[in-house]
Amino acid sequence: MIAEQNRQKGLYWTPRGGNNARDIWASCHLFTSVTENKRTGDTETTTVIVDMGQHEAPWLFANGEYDKVVPALDDCLAVKGLSKPENPASAVFLTHCHSDHTTGIFEYLQMGTEIPPVYGSRYTLNALQKGLIDLKIPSEKWPEMKCVKTGDSIRIGNLTVDVFPASHSVPGCFSFRLSNGEASIFHSGDTKADETSFLGRGVDVSSYKRIGRNGGVDLMTFDSTAVHLKGHATSEAEIFETYREIFEQNAGRQIIAPLSAAHMERLASVVCAAAAAGKNVVINGGASMEKNVLALKTAGYDLHAKCPNIQIVGAKGAAKLDPETCVTVTTGNYAEPNSPFVRCLRGEKNGFVLRPDAVVIAPTSGDKNEKLLSVLEKSGLDGLKLITGIEKPRVYGSGHAQADDFVKIANSVRPRMVAPIHCFKERADVLNALAAKNGFMTLPEYPHNGTTVVVSGRTGVRIESVKSPEWFGIRHETDSKGNVKTSFVKVADGGYSTDYDKEAGIARRQKEAMKKIAGYRFAAARKRGFIAERRGGDGR
């Protein structure tokens, strides 16, 4: 955070995680509002945190010494055993429920930290509560949780936070506009310009245009994960149509649809496509998918009410339905070992219903299918047919904005300057070039973690300071009675493995080799009819 002395009126933004040197994990951003009380002349300061994620690859940190790694926030949170911050954060706002945006909260609570009130959608807060219960964190230590919805305007001290819908891979995603009368920032969160959703609504471009018509914003911090890709991210409506077509072309066959356990937007699209094709649905993706489906229900999303013409059952109900009338939504697209589908393919008698001539839809393509293809071939079920992202590209869609998504949103919000988030430097450079091409100003350098940007009506947008980011490395040790002891230490950003570049080079060469192997295998599999042809066939 910015030092109290000599503070200029305005809004301060500091990424603490997500704008990493080499990856996108641990999203966490500080926003500090500095204004003058017109009655007393005193300086008033309010800080909020947007997202508190953890790093998804702790083994790359300090040679794998720690179980968990989170951005160091002891300058705005009262961490047990450390000095209390001068200006503690007043609130936490969550853009969505993914672990790289939320589960730092779990770690800080286990470190003995008091977390200020947490604001999020009903779905996001339900997922947060489920995680707290699973970790057996006592309820008296939980932060206060405040459910907000699209269109809400929340006043925190001298800062106003307005809530806008975002489109990602889960329901209840938000973008936020933060303003204080001196300056304004639009924070996209993870998003794309998809206005379609089978769980309510996608983004609301009309609300973005209202921002633009009312003067725009001074700065837009924008999801840059996939801006290097041309065009728009595939919409849920396009994905729905592709699945519906496949289901109708294979009306008399069982269909297996592996998905990510957490991608509930995609699950809803697939279920609705099945209903449109008159196919019943079995949801059998293991414990993780079951938890997410339950979270949908408790947040008020009712797939049964949305698709009353079909039966939607869980794993236990599968045996009561004719497999040929069903789409089984499961996990295992990356051959995850705990997937019920993958365990069945490997010969385990786990009750997973699988016809020997089923159609398997693997939404990714190339080397990303290599593991699943290997499991399928070893299963000995030669009657299975595989449809991948090669044959049907629109069975997959990223939850992140591509180039045209950025242009559409930026032209609606009309920021005076754009800054990249959720990316590493190379991807940030792509966003900056794209922004400049479309007439938007950019910062002179990559705002990596620890960079503080000040937005002021007097001086515009500029980099205030650049500091080396710090992290907490955390260990959880369980004693013989099952009690968990948590310890932590602050580590500099340089604590990331010095072998990272070497590891990345090895991984890159392995990926290139896997692509070649995948190409050979796919060619051989297609030759013997294991994989459907892309053109001219009926998808069987």
Tell me what each language-model feature is.
Residues 2-36, 41-91, 98-276, 280-286, ...:
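His/Asp/Glu-rich metal-coordinating catalytic cores
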Residues 218, 388-390:
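Short, structured interface segments
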Residues 391-400:
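Short beta->alpha junction loops
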Residues 416:
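A donor-sugar binding/catalytic signature common to diverse glycosyltransferases
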Residues 506, 511-540:
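Non-Sec secretion/translocation targeting segments of pathogen effectors
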